[in-house]
Amino acid sequence: MPRRKSWMLVALALAVILLAPQWAAAQDKTVKIGALYPMTGRAGLYGLDSVAAAEMAVAEINAKGGVKGYKLEFINTDSQAKPDYSVQVAKRYITNDKVDFLFGAVSSAVGLALTEVSNQYKKIFIGTDHASTQTTVDKLQPYYFRVANNTFQSMAAGALYLKERQKTKPWETIAYIGPDYAYGHDQINELKYNLDRFGVKYKIVGEYWPKLAAPDYTAFITSILKDKPDVLVCGFWGGDTVAFIKQALPYGLFQKMLYFHPDAGGNYELMSATGDELPLGLVLSGRHHNNWPATAANKKFVDDFFKKTGRYPSYAAEGAYAGVYAIAQAVDKVGNPNDADALVKALEGMKLKLPEDPEGFTSYIDPLTHQIVQQQAIGETVANKDFPPATRMLGNWKVYQAEELMPPMEYLKKNGSDYLKSKLK
């Protein structure tokens, strides 16, 4: 081999050795998001929509160059809606996959399990859909943040709605049906608290506790009809809501009482699954609505989701979309995804302009509870064929201001975790 050629090969080899760390660093400049969403079963649509919307947000951000030189990478594992399995995956994400953020979760049981892992490993967990208030009050820890309304906010809005309705359409008695775990119990407890807080007179005539994903609600439906409440408050979500309403229709339940479902009842999944079967005049709400607010930003989000998936989004989609943008803003402020404590400070108080924000309002993360603060709209089912296959959507909106829906200080002092109480001093 000629001497000149051999020297060139040696020089090339040295260059490869010297530059390898830089190439590796460049390849490692990613913000890795490890998500856990259910992809099958009654909760499956929530997971499918969440993943699609998160991918939308990642693509939008990466198309603009990423954040501070970092590209976003999103991975998801089917949580199977099982807390124990989700904990195993989360630990694998952290130790093997080296994710920078934990993300997602639909079931509150899964969310409550994952927040323990987040705290143990000091890895930020962005909650995008599960709604139990416990994660932002009773069990709040430094590295947990939620970017969708929790049950306390929904029940505060619900209590205000019932207070207003009592003046024009008098009612006295309430019954409640919801799933027998934290999410279901939180709703009725927080509704009672807020009804009392706002001075509403009421009497509870029945509480009914089917298991999550129960196949048959007949016994509960007949008990409700026997107890004859003026208002039936429902705490189901997802496929459970659809199944309950379809099973209750032959009994004429919705003609005999007000059906009121202020947390998850207004999900587009219900509208698309029931069509003309869905009675008019049900009072529902959710964490995002495809037809409220009527802003350009909300229309764009809904249209972009439809272009990507061929269907309109359930409310879970916007929560996942918001979560990715919260991560991007935090990394942009800190400069990297590695300093968890700096990222916590960046997230506390963060303003997030989201598709669900009406004109003149911007969502923000409460620095005390790490809970996003948002307005909530409650509506009635009305005829509307703008979002097929649904033939019903919500209308006749009542909108409740964000700050009045948050837990008051005395509630936080009584129920808060040690971490939250330390912030209140």
List the predicted regions and their residue ranges.
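Beta-alpha junction/loop-to-helix N-cap segments that form part of ligand/metal-binding clefts
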Residues: 45-52, 64-138, 147, 209-218, ...
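Bacterial N-terminal signal peptides that target proteins for export
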Residues: 1-11
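Extracytoplasmic "Venus flytrap"
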Residues: 31-55, 77-84, 106-107, 177-186, ...
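Extracellular/periplasmic periplasmic-binding protein-like sensory domains
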Residues: 248-321, 332-334, 338, 391-424
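Extracytoplasmic ligand/sensor domains, especially the bilobed periplasmic-binding protein
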Residues: 99-207, 256-281
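Signal peptide-proximal N-terminal region
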Residues: 28-31, 51-74, 196-202
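Bacterial N-terminal signal peptides
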Residues: 10-21
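Segments of small-molecule ligand-sensing domains
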Residues: 307-317, 328-399, 407, 424
